[in-house]
């Protein structure tokens, strides 16, 4: 009888150790799986307007227009804002700026409205990609500068100042991090002249550093 008790105790201890190890192993696996998902990129297309999108995708004319209109609404909320037209023109160039709508009209809280009018760059294009699960499309407004001295000159940049290459027509496709399509915060305060250009320059420098680091890692 004593021997039987010893055997049962050993079996129980072994089972308990296995039971404790299994959840830990599963948890570690889950963390790695989530990390992999978070780092995964997605393919998006960039267009100057709805017609540009429709010409490239004749069967998606309705989706092109919907995404374009949604991007325009986002641009009203998230584009950099300037206290004067001159400040905006100095950053983006002549005929590239428009008066920003009042916060309430742009879908923001009325109490956040600053006194006086603000100016913002015109939307120069938009980024369009599949939403998670494939149900519909997500979009982000893109801007560009016609000022040769600006870091954003001739490039598509988003509201945060991140660059996505030449602002060309014809539907350019590229791979971007999932964060690129994440909603951007509404902008209710003005930026100083040249401030957005500094953000673009900083983001471009970070992108180059990241690309260099990735290249070195892959090279061994």
From Swiss-Prot:
Start and end residues of each stretch annotated as Disordered: 181-220
InterPro entries for the chain: Biofilm_formation_YgiB
Start-end of Low complexity biased regions: 203-220
Annotated coiled-coil segments of the chain: none
Pfam family, one: DUF1190
Similarity comment: family membership: Belongs to the UPF0441 family.
The protein, known as: UPF0441 protein Spro_4274
Organism this protein belongs to: Serratia proteamaculans (strain 568)
């Amino acid at each position: 009888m004593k021997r039987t008790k010893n055997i049962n105790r050993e079996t129980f201890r072994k089972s308990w150790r296995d039971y404790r190890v299994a959840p830990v192993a599963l948890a570690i696996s889950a963390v790695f799986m989530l990390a992999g998902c978070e780092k995964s990129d997605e393919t998006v297309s960039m267009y100057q307007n709805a017609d540009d999108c429709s010409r490239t995708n004749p069967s998606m004319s309705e989706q092109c227009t919907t995404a374009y209109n949604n991007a325009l609404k986002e641009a009203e909320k998230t584009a950099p804002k300037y206290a004067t037209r001159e400040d905006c023109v100095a950053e983006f160039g002549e005929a590239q700026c428009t008066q920003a709508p009042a916060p309430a009209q742009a879908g923001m809280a009325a109490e956040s409205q600053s006194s006086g009018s603000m100016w913002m760059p015109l939307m120069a294009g938009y980024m369009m990609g599949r939403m998670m699960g494939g149900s519909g499309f997500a979009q982000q407004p893109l801007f560009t500068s016609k000022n040769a001295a600006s870091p954003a000159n001739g490039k598509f940049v988003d509201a945060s100042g991140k660059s996505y290459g030449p602002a060309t027509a014809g539907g350019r496709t590229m791979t971007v991090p999932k964060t690129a399509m994440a909603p951007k915060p509404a902008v209710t305060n003005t930026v100083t002249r040249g401030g957005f250009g500094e953000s673009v320059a900083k983001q471009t420098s970070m992108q180059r550093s990241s690309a260099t680091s990735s290249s070195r890692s892959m090279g061994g």
